[in-house]
Amino acid sequence: MSLCQGSAMQKLIAKTEGPMAGVGRVGGFNRPSGGLGQSSAEQQLQARAGERASQNRFMAVLEPQRELGGRMARGDGLQADWVRQFSSMQVEDPLAFSAEYQRAYAGYEQRQAARPAARVLGYGGSMFMPTMPQQQLQQQVAPQQTAQAALQEAELERYLEREFDVLEGELAPPEVPEALSAPLLDHEQLGFQESAKAIYATLSAPIHKDKFGASKFMGLMRQVSTGDVTLSKSESGYTGLHMTAGGEAVGAEYRAVTDEVVQVPEVAAALPLAGEERSLASQMEDLLNKVDIAGLSSNEAAMRILS
């Protein structure tokens, strides 16, 4: 046995004696001064357990876990205290709305939330809204609807006016320039036009319509009466017909015929006139009955009748 290691008798004596330097397995240590209660076996065991724990690796790992658990428990308590403090805080924002405005807005949200439920139950929802705000809303909406309706009506009128102008332009007859009418016709051409008007009016009567209605002669007389066709004037006289607008020749050139005096039958001359002159239509009817235009072209027939 070495000198550094104490015997069992020495350890027992050390427990009962006063303060003295003891020798242990690890090394010497100073015992605290005091009575028997302070140097009891329990305190020595705790001291030795602490020394062993400091030298044991596994005990060193368990101690931080115990400390962490204690810290977490203390942290939960602190967090609960922080939540209670935060919820009890009252922040005074200088830019916040007034309490009166917030109450009014809360009432507005309640009314808006009640509207869909009222429609589902079959109500219009007007009972949930006060009378004055609804009247003000109607007064504000009515002028807007009136202005919008007036604008739509004005746009519709402008559109219809443009469409009517286009239709009138398509349906209107082409305008004949004034330079192509009477001022370009001389005395003979104007007389020929007036005679053609009388002939066309006479042959358009129901009594002659079946006979001359579909003839080319009637078409020519109509064109002459409207001024679309007139006599062609040359150095040798009037030798044909042409279009007034373009100068194109109409029909074939007619041959000059000798003037013939048509003898009116005595029976026709002896008809009673009742003191009045016979109308031009009656005279033309008698003339057409006596003039033979068979085998003649439309131009020749016109010249034969008008000569």
Curated annotation (Swiss-Prot):
It is found in: Cytoplasm, Cytosol; Peroxisome. GO terms for biological process: protein transport. Its main location: cytoplasm. Gene3D superfamilies: 6.10.280.230. It holds the Pfam family PEX18_PEX21_C. GO terms for cellular component: cytosol; peroxisome. Keywords: Cytoplasm, Peroxisome, Protein transport, Thioester bond, Transport, Ubl conjugation. Monoubiquitinated at Cys-4; acts as a signal for PEX21 extraction and is required for proper export from peroxisomes and recycling. InterPro entries: PEX18_PEX21_C (IPR056940). The keyword Protein biosynthesis does not apply. There is a cross-link at residue 4 (Glycyl cysteine thioester (Cys-Gly) (interchain with G-Cter in ubiquitin)). Residues 23-52 are annotated as: Disordered. It comes from the Eukaryota. Interacts with PEX7. Mediates peroxisomal import of proteins containing a C-terminal PTS2-type peroxisomal targeting signal via its interaction with PEX7. Interaction with PEX7 only takes place when PEX7 is associated with cargo proteins containing a PTS2 peroxisomal targeting signal. PEX7 along with PTS2-containing cargo proteins are then translocated through the PEX13-PEX14 docking complex together with PEX21. Belongs to the peroxin-21 family. This is Peroxisomal protein PEX21. The lineage of its organism: Eukaryota, Fungi, Dikarya, Ascomycota, Saccharomycotina.
